[in-house]
Amino acid sequence: GSSDSGDTVKIGIFEPTSGQNGAGGKKEILGIEYANSIKPTVTINGKEYKVQLITADNASEQSKAPAAAQTLISKGVSVVIGTYGSSCAIAAGPLFRDAKIPAIGTSCTNPQVTEGNDYYFRVSYIDPFQGAVMANFANKEKGSVNCALIIESGDDYSAGFGNYFQKEMERLGGKATVLEFQKAETDFSTIMATIKSAGYDGIFAPVSIETAAMIISQARDSGVTCPIMAGDTWDDISIAQRTGDKATDIYFSAFFDAADESNTEGKAFVEGFKKWVAEDKTRIENNGGTADAISSVTPCGYDAYMAAVNAIEKAGSTEGAAIRDALAALEVKGLVTGDLKFDENGDAIKTYAVIKTIKDGDIVYSSTYNG
């Protein structure tokens, strides 16, 4: 359980602030911190407690994730929020479970995060849904029926998401052929040569932010002109900044877009968040050097925090087991990425996704998917 120092309740932030997912982790933390600025206290049995946020960097590394999780556990957190990057969530999950501390995933979309773990929940949609969304988009909107599927070897997110895309493509009568690369690869010329000679009419690349920019630039430099598609990871302004005018015909699914007029809760979030970021130099830096762009992982951080404080109040306790039970039964209306309710696996029940594209160095809204 957790011991409270004075009248505080501790919430752990389990996120990468370094490594290949550091940029994404920082944007999720901003969402969590912004939510905390709006709701800085919780009321437990009529008594007000201040929420103290404690961060541990999992460094985007599967091997370092358990130590980061252990840090939070030893500091007596009541609940954990995170992480960006499914591999780190999967690696840390058993530690949270054994310590009876519930964790709320932000944008970690691999089904394995919550599978067989009663203590892991998540607010985002998951890869089977996202894979189907993008396969339908590729097939029906872009006419891409014979895709190259670029996968990072040994990465849970990349392989899992790619597999769901491939299955749905085949169900629709199309094809997706796997082309693998090693983790630290920076030269994709062999893959591009294969794509050209095989005549693939689309690329699906569920890869990191760092790799995304290289794949886009090298594809266009080598004369590969087909649509390049991906998922939530690509919703990061740095990809647009680093690819410039090479970023043509790029599409990816995301959790949220500020331009979707049908999302009223989202509009209020966008206004408030931009103001809050603009107040502080470090916040601007962590948001990718701007107060105007909002990555769709940021509202995932916000929604996860709101779920956490709601569950603590419902539980009437700072004990992990009680908070876990409250989360399992939780229903929260009017969050930024939609109403929240968890299924028996602890996954958010979601039917909503947006598809974005890159235009004139910016990430812009393309369409909405309602399954």
Could you say what each language-model-derived stretch is?
Residues 96-98, 162-259:
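Extracellular/periplasmic bilobed ligand-binding domains
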Residues 23-28, 42-114, 123, 181-189, ...:
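Beta-alpha junction/loop-to-helix N-cap segments that form part of ligand/metal-binding clefts
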Residues 281-299, 307-360, 364:
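Segments of small-molecule ligand-sensing domains
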Residues 120-183, 201-202:
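An alpha-beta-alpha
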Residues 221-300, 357-358, 363-370:
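Extracellular/periplasmic periplasmic-binding protein-like sensory domains
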Residues 1-10, 41-45, 74, 369-371:
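Short, low-complexity disordered leader/linker segments with a strong preference
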Residues 12-33, 56-62, 85-87, 150-159, ...:
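Extracytoplasmic "Venus flytrap"
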Residues 13-15, 72-84, 104-106, 148-151, ...:
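Periplasmic-binding protein-like
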